[in-house]
Amino acid sequence: MAKFVFITGGVVSSIGKGIVAASLGRLLKSRNYTVSILKLDPYINVDPGTMSPYQHGEVFVTDDGAETDLDLGHYERFTDTNMSKLNNVTTGAIYQAVIYKERRGDYQGSTVQVIPHVTQEIKERIRRVARETNPDVVLVEVGGTVGDIESLPFLEAIRQFRKDVGRANVAYVHVTLVPLIKAAGEMKTKPTQHSVKELRSIGIQPDVLVCRCEQPLPRSIKEKISEFCDVPVECVIQAQDAPSIYDVPLVLEQEGLAQRVLQILNLEPQQPDLREWELLVQRLHHPQEQVEIAIVGKYVRLTDAYLSVAEALRHAGLALNAGVTLRWISSEEVEERGPEALLADVDGVVVPGGFGSRGIEGKVATIRYVRERGIPFLGLCLGMQCAVIDWGCNIAGLERANSYEFDPDTPHPVISLLPEQKDVEHLGGTLRLGLYPCRILPDTLAAKLYGESIVYERHRHRYEFNNAYRSLFLESGYVISGVSPDNRLVEIIELPSHPFFIATQFHPEFRSRPNRPHPLFLGLIEAALRSRSRPQALQLQNTG
């Protein structure tokens, strides 16, 4: 039978529950325990797929096509385990299921209520993860902050869960904040006390407290928290601000988090093997070289909108002993100031995904600039579509070439709606989503980078390269290096006479791991390092 660890958060939002859950998952896995992680999100959206990136950040896509919270990206990267639609549940999905069952007559005339019907559905989703993934330990992160009205059904469900499965099979970990009042030079425990009091009023006594702090917690502060919160002092875990998220597992291991959790769950406290992770962190902090990569996007005001892109770049840097500095550039700013003012001194450029026409001209101008100057370039999803628009307008002679998404009246829709999307009415969950195969053409940059003839990548799009223009693009020097196995969909394009210019319709960033960087990002950083070693960027005019 699986054991369960419930991770809640208090005092403030964005306190780091997801990183704590992912780090604990890594620590348990390093002890040869299998782990699955579930994120419970208290918003009423069925999933985050239609939410603004400014409100939610990145939408992380799993192999099975689920549009999920960005924390699932942390879970995958830290535990090196694929998540699925089982691993993210929202209030909206819970209520949708409950209402469907009520309409079907499953409740046999009962008055449908939060308790027991909603809480039973929540508990069933938790059990389903254990049943279908069969891990030793299920970690459950409860989104939101203790005290939020939206989180109450989830907290009630996890309170009941210990009674359902037995006290020895459940541990409660509460992540809280111990702020430093700099004017007084004191660390204050009162916010933690009140947060635990709120949690206890619901009926949950935390077993472990993970205390976020700027400075080390003195023993006296730990003892005070222990006294007021009724938690053993050894279970008051210091989580001091770390230089990077990849330091956090090592910080929590030093504090004994995994050991305490295993004791509570009556599991063997096996010796961890963190040698690979320690080497990774050492490389992160002591790079031998540096590169600067520009990310030119629509949502750079909230960098979490491109979280997996940023992490994939860092992963590639780690493998090459190179530090990667990110320069965040709004594509709208490119429209205002021009690419020369913003990109002249970068070592490489990524144009990531997005939706809608805002900022598109800036993305296209960016791609033309890097194409003509030989700056290493990687386009992702919308980034590939903008590369196609640039080539159509500026090389292939297609005046006013555009995407049907941005200009339905364009005379040259080089990017068109997927045929299966033409009758779609709803936005949510209707994109081409999840893992699909891609056939790599031999003797191409993609073939060199992947080293395989068939690869599998995650998708999230509604528009695709228009095959009516495929011959024209090939004749004008474009190389289509990746296609769907039936040759219907263009998946990868590249320019062979450019030092490094490749773009994909899929999202390779979702499959990158710290210990296994994605080949396309690895290729970009390698090219950026080569570019940096040159006295100046190669000047190319109208090249591929």
UniProtKB/Swiss-Prot annotation:
Free-text activity regulation comment from the record: Allosterically activated by GTP, when glutamine is the substrate; GTP has no effect on the reaction when ammonia is the substrate. The allosteric effector GTP functions by stabilizing the protein conformation that binds the tetrahedral intermediate(s) formed during glutamine hydrolysis. Inhibited by the product CTP, via allosteric rather than competitive inhibition.
Reactions the enzyme catalyzes: UTP + L-glutamine + ATP + H2O = CTP + L-glutamate + ADP + phosphate + 2 H(+); L-glutamine + H2O = L-glutamate + NH4(+); UTP + NH4(+) + ATP = CTP + ADP + phosphate + 2 H(+)
Keyword NADP: no
Domain of life, source organism: Bacteria
Glutamine amidotransferase type-1 domain span: 292-534
Pfam assignment, any one: GATase
GO BP annotations listed: 'de novo' CTP biosynthetic process; pyrimidine nucleobase biosynthetic process
Binding site for CTP: S13, D148, I149, E150, K188, T189, K190, P191, T192, Q193, K224
Residue positions binding UTP: S13, K188, T189, K190, P191, T192, Q193, K224
Positions bound to L-glutamine: Y54, G354, L382, G383, M384, Q385, E405, R462
GO cellular component: cytosol
E.C. code: 6.3.4.2
Record note on quaternary structure: Homotetramer.
Protein family membership: Belongs to the CTP synthase family.
Protein name as annotated: CTP synthase
Organism: Synechococcus sp. (strain JA-3-3Ab) (Cyanobacteria bacterium Yellowstone A-Prime)
